[in-house]
UniProtKB/Swiss-Prot annotation:
The GPI-anchor is attached to the protein in the endoplasmic reticulum and serves to target the protein to the cell surface. There, the glucosamine-inositol phospholipid moiety is cleaved off and the GPI-modified mannoprotein is covalently attached via its lipidless GPI glycan remnant to the 1,6-beta-glucan of the outer cell wall layer. It comes from Candida albicans (strain SC5314 / ATCC MYA-2876) (Yeast). This is Hyphally regulated cell wall protein 1. Residues 607-665, 675-707, 725-783 have a biased composition (Gly residues). It is a lipid-anchor; GPI-anchor. Residues 896-919 form a propeptide. The gene is HYR1. It comes from the Eukaryota.
Length: 919
């Protein structure tokens, strides 16, 4: 059955194709729907008009002979539009006469869809719609050639689309294609010597990255509102453009941006080429010579600063003859049988508008109803150098055009260049020699112009000015009193260009470096100066749409700007003397937080069992045996929650190292409370060793481990040990340790075993006020160990816990582990950097040199490690906080000195070295 069905279908198709329609005499057909099966041929001299139709379909090939006409028109009122479909994959479409499809009277959507196995136009094709709504016109075929005239127009602009050929194939245009109120986005390669004329706000977008346009093909911007846009992300091409001026636009699909070697756009007067650049992606437009570079400026064309306009008349109006073929509305369709007797076809005496057509003169539009397109070839002879002139006169009100051409002229395709005069109403005369001399004059006039800065950008007119910003990448080098400044501008843009329904995205990065030099005067003797920079970042999001979709683009602009130089070096040094307790306070407070919990759990028993008479002075400069367990409970919470400074300042006879313990006590004050409250092992260890210390160790146990527990619990494990050792000896320790450590942990210590066993966290974090008042009287015999432990907890706690949070390291007897740490900050260490804009941020570049010392058995400090770190300059947008950043910053203490905070990786090498030495 299926075989029979296929056989019947084949027979019917053969009958339809064989039923060809031959239009030999003129005729008019009327009706809403028209359908024609088989090939249709309109013979020469015949006119066929199909009127009052809304749908006209052809199922076969179409041929209109020379001297014949085919009119299809919708005149059914403003609602019903014209739809014409001619789609055959096996038969050609050939036009040598006139084809006119007209839907201008309709207010609804019209569609012209004509295609075949091949498309050839040697005559005239007119496609007209109202433009009230978006209409489409497609002339497609794999083999597509136009040697005649195609006019596609709308009464007004409504984003109508027109397309030629088959996507990703090649169309050949040797004739004239006129577009009015249209959007033309070809999806094919274009070759030939023809012209596409954009008029009445027509927008042409050559938008495919893999398709090319031959330089011999011409684009003519006829009015001031038309635009030609080229896809930026594409291979470099040169597009031949005529009529650029009076405000029309040439552009790219990306914003125009320069780089270190080129400006955003450059005009070369010697060649007449305009270069547009989206960073590293240039495109070239051959617009002609004689333009004034001061009249170029950057504007928008359905994008963000992506086009250039020229605020002046077209200086060189040499337009090829093929671009001057009149873009008329075409002949009118016959309305009655009587109109069929009136000739309505145009006369085209040259069969091709290829290179031969460019050798012919061009006539202007006739004002009569019968359009006459006549051209006569010039009788130039290749073997003669004589100048031959040809004049063609057209009857009625047509314009006479005189063309003079040298047969040996080097103009493209041997065609005469027609230079339109300003009057443009009577005669159009050209001479290649005259235009050449004018171009040379214009070139000599503009060649002297160097780079010009306008409100929209910098324009380069000569090669000398284009290299003005070329420079080599160098780093910033500084010496006392002088700095070399480099302005490094980086622009990274992600742009999305959108029409109504469709968007595309592109990414562009541009770099520019400009060196200069400044002299700086030091504010003090040998303090060098450094240059601060302000970095400004602007981010914008752009949404564009086309007919299909929308998309967004993000554009980020970053610029570094140099400012007034300021003091660059600040050094903070803490020595081993007891007077330098401030340095210890700063170091300790920063580092105690990480190690508290670890130290607390381990130092609890040490404080409890080892701080007899000697350990008392370590942690609180309190009484000997009485402060043994108070050392554990009292110094724990005191050190942890806030009595680091008391520890240092109140140590008994160990004032020298106690002051360094003071530096450690500040570490303890910040971190002890945190660690004490969180260390579970502190309560266990404290309860066991605290009671031992208090009852059994007394003065002996204090002297044995006082130095160790002082160092460990002094700053780090204070809060944990406070609650733990208190369980055994809390009441005793509380009375002895109070003045040194117990400003905050006293309340827990006062209750002795109760707080110790159950309230380790409470003692560490919040019981300082009671303990502080009781322990003032207790100053024991632990002055020596107290001073050692103080110094150990002073800087050891600070240094170790700075980079290794929670890392536990025991001090070794005989070493003053409370040794000082020198921190030298070189760079822009400025409390108030100088800037010129409140919206800008300051980029700080620092060099951190950290030297740590330890005191040996001979009592002299000895450096054992030095770390120089040069971090990468970093800036954050203003009013933005990034707590996760590991980039070091410069903070200023209350006394005006500077310290390095953040950047945990900076001190990691230092701490590892210290741990290795201690082991």
């Amino acid at each position: 059955m299926k075989v029979v069905s296929n056989f019947i279908f084949t027979i019917l198709l053969t009958l339809n194709l064989s039923a060809a329609l031959e239009v030999v005499t003129s005729r008019i057909d009327r009706g809403g729907i028209q359908g024609f099966h088989g090939d249709v041929k309109v013979h020469s001299g015949a006119t066929w008009a199909i009127l009052g139709t809304t749908l006209c379909s052809f199922f076969g090939g179409l041929e209109v002979e020379k001297g014949a006409s085919l009119f299809i028109k919708s005149d059914n009122g403003p609602v019903l539009a014209l739809n014409v479909a001619l789609s055959t994959l096996v038969r050609p479409v050939i036009n040598n006469g006139v084809i006119s499809l007209n839907s201008k009277s309709s207010t609804s959507f019209s569609n012209f869809d004509i295609g075949g196995s091949s498309f050839t136009n040697n005559g005239e094709i007119y496609l007209a719609s109202s433009g009230l709504v978006k209409s489409t016109a497609y002339l497609y075929a794999r083999e597509w050639t136009n040697n005649g005239l195609i006019v596609a127009y709308q009464n007004q602009k409504a984003a109508g689309n027109i397309a030629f050929g088959t996507a990703y194939q090649t169309i050949t245009n040797n004739g004239q294609i006129c577009l009015r109120h249209q959007d033309f986005v070809p999806a094919t390669k274009i070759k030939g010597t023809g012209c596409v004329t954009a008029d009445e706000d027509t927008w042409i977008k050559l938008g495919n990255t893999i398709l090319s346009v031959e330089p011999t093909h011409n684009f003519y911007l006829k009015d001031s509102k038309s635009s030609l846009i080229v896809h930026a992300v594409s291979s470099n091409q040169t597009f031949t453009v005529h009529g650029f001026g009076n405000g029309n636009k040439l552009g790219l699909t990306l914003p125009l941006t320069g780089n270190r070697d080129h400006f955003r756009f450059e005009y070369y007067p010697d060649t007449g080429i305009l270069q547009l650049r989206a960073a590293a992606l240039p495109q070239y437009f051959k617009i002609g010579k004689g333009y004034d570079s001061k009249l170029f400026r950057i504007v928008n064309s359905r994008g963000l600063k992506n086009a250039v306009t020229y605020d002046g008349p077209v200086p060189n109006n040499e337009i090829p003859a093929v671009c001057l073929i009149p873009c008329t509305n075409g002949p009118s369709a016959p309305e009655s049988e009587s109109d069929l007797n009136t000739p309505t076809t145009s006369s085209i005496e040259t069969s091709s508008y290829s290179s031969a057509a460019t050798e012919s003169s061009v006539v202007s539009e006739s004002s009569s109803a019968v359009d006459s397109l006549t051209s006569s070839s010039l009788s130039s002879k290749s073997e003669s150098s004589d100048v031959v002139s040809s004049t063609t006169n057209i009857e009625s009100s047509s314009t006479a055009i005189e063309t003079t051409m040298n047969s040996e002229s080097s103009t493209d395709a041997g065609s005469s260049s027609i230079s339109q005069s300003e009057s443009s109403s009577t005669a159009i005369t050209s001479s290649s020699e005259t235009s050449s001399s004018e171009s040379m004059s214009a070139s000599s006039t503009t060649a002297s112009n160097t780079s010009i800065e306008t409100d929209s950008g910098i324009v380069s007119q000569s090669e000398s000015s284009s290299n003005a910003l070329s420079s080599t990448e160098q780093s910033i080098t500084s010496s006392p009193g002088q700095s070399t400044i480099y302005v490094n501008s980086t622009v990274t843009s992600t742009i999305t260009s959108c029409d109504e329904n469709k968007c595309t995205e592109d990414v562009v990065t541009i770099f520019t470096t400009v060196p200069c030099s400044t002299d700086c005067v030091p504010t003090t003797g040998d303090i060098p100066m450094s240059t601060s920079y302000t970095q400004r970042t602007v981010t914008s999001t752009i949404t564009n749409c086309d007919e299909v979709s929308c998309s967004q683009d993000v554009v980020t602009y970053t610029t570094n700007v140099p400012h007034t130089t300021v003091d660059a070096t600040t050094t903070t040094t803490t020595s081993t003397g007891g007077d330098n307790s401030t340095g210890g306070n700063e170091s300790g407070s920063n580092h105690g937080s990480g190690a508290g919990s670890n130290e607390g759990s381990q130092s609890g028993p040490n404080n409890g069992s080892g701080s007899g008479s000697e350990g008392g002075s370590n942690n609180g400069s309190g009484s000997g045996s009485d402060s043994g367990s108070n050392n554990g409970s009292g110094s724990g919470s005191n050190n942890g929650s806030g009595s680091g400074s008391n520890n240092g300042s109140g140590s008994g006879s160990g004032s020298t190292e106690g002051s360094e313990g003071g530096s450690g006590s500040n570490e303890g004050s910040n971190h002890g409370s945190n660690e004490g409250s969180g260390s579970g092992s502190g309560s266990q260890t404290g309860s066991g060793s605290g009671s031992n210390n208090g009852s059994g160790s007394g003065s002996q146990s204090g002297s044995g481990s006082g130095s160790q527990s002082g160092s460990e619990s002094g700053s780090n494990s204070g809060s944990n040990e406070g609650s733990n050792p208190g369980a055994g000896n809390g009441s005793n320790e509380g009375s002895g340790q109070g003045s040194g450590n117990g400003s905050e942990a006293g309340s827990g210590q006062g209750s002795g075993p109760n707080n110790g066993s159950g309230s380790g966290h409470n003692d560490g974090s919040g019981s300082g006020s009671n303990q502080g008042s009781n322990p003032g009287a207790g100053s024991g015999s632990g002055s020596e160990s107290g001073s050692n432990a103080g110094s150990h907890s002073g800087s050891n706690e600070g240094a170790k816990t700075d980079s290794i949070e929670g890392f536990h390291t025991e001090s070794k007897p005989g070493f003053n582990t409370g040794a000082h740490t020198d921190a030298t900050v070189t760079g822009n260490s400025v409390a108030n950097p100088v800037t010129t804009s409140t919206e800008s941020d300051t980029t700080i570049s620092v060099t951190v040199s950290i030297t740590s010392y330890m005191t040996g058995f001979d009592g002299k400090p000895k450096p054992f490690t030095t770390v120089d770190v040069i971090p990468v300059p970093h800036s954050m947008p203003s009013n933005t906080t990034d707590s996760s950043s590991s980039v070091p910053t410069i903070d200023t203490n209350e006394n005006g000195s500077s310290i390095v905070t953040g950047g945990k990786s900076i001190l990691f090498g230092l701490i590892v070295s210290m741990v290795v030495l201690f082991m």
